[in-house]
A protein has these predicted regions:
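Short, flexible segments with low predicted structural confidence
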Residues: 1-2, 16-17, 33-35
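Short, well-ordered beta-strand segments in beta-rich or mixed alpha/beta enzyme
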Residues: 2-8, 39-66, 104
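Short, surface-exposed ligand-recognition loops at beta-strand->loop->(often short) alpha-helix junctions
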Residues: 9-17
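Short alpha-helical
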Residues: 13, 47, 69
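An amphipathic, aromatic/His-enriched active-site/gating alpha helix that lines ligand/cofactor pockets
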Residues: 24, 30-36, 55-89
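Glycine-rich beta-strand-turn "strand-cap" elements at beta-sheet edges
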Residues: 41-46, 75-122
Length: 122
């Protein structure tokens, strides 16, 4: 799986324009071949900070999306930004769910207080 994270720092007063652009992209992008998920997040402390997270089945699907007109629209929002887009692409080779959380928490509760302290130090 490939995850692309895009951070946007929008010029004050351009928040709604950016939001409309991003919202218009959700449905068509989510329907693209290989798109697992597409989410837009807004910082609760600063409405001018957005994070766009997309998950793709393969790098080929992501590359096809990056070459699309729709992604070009996103790149064209630079006039709305205080600074350039921050883009990170991650290749995920393994992922775990809630069972991993439960397992880790069980493991911690079985440790003695001394072992837990040592574990934090290491």
């Amino acid at each position: 799986m490939i995850v692309i994270k895009i951070i946007m720092n929008v010029i004050p007063g351009k928040h709604l324009e950016m939001m409309q652009t991003l919202l218009s992209m959700i449905e068509p992008t989510a329907k693209e071949a290989g798109c697992i998920s597409y989410g837009i997040f807004c910082d609760i402390e600063d409405k001018n900070h957005f994070c766009l997270l997309q998950e793709w089945e393969t790098r080929e699907y992501l590359d096809h999306h990056i070459a699309s007109h729709r992604f070009g629209i996103l790149l064209g929002t630079k006039a709305l930004l205080r600074e350039p887009l921050e883009i990170q692409i991650h290749t995920v080779s393994h992922s775990e769910g809630i069972d991993a959380i439960h397992g880790a928490r069980k493991k911690q509760t079985k440790m003695s207080p001394i072992d837990r302290q040592r574990n934090l130090i290491e």
